[in-house]
Amino acid sequence: MTLSWDTAAWEDFQYWLDTDKAMARKIRALLKECLRTPTTGTGKPEPLKHDFAGYWSRRITDEHRLVYKVAGDEVRIAACRYHYG
């Protein structure tokens, strides 16, 4: 599988790299797991509904979520800061 980023998601990740290295490490670990097993594993993966149908979410913390979409051989990151956009 390959990993790609929406512009806003990449900016979210850059924010963590600049402000909270531990959070960035946690996100990296979740990303690796998303590439191996996109719909199971840590962070309580759950399919999203309504406007985000087709996307999945994993908990980074109580406040922040990793939101991504699996399409074929690609995992596209939509957000990694706050809740659902």
Task: List PLM regions with ranges.
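A short, surface-exposed loop/turn module that caps and links secondary-structure elements
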Residues: K32-R59
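Enriched for short, Lys/Arg-rich terminal
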Residues: T2, A8-R25, A29, T42, ...
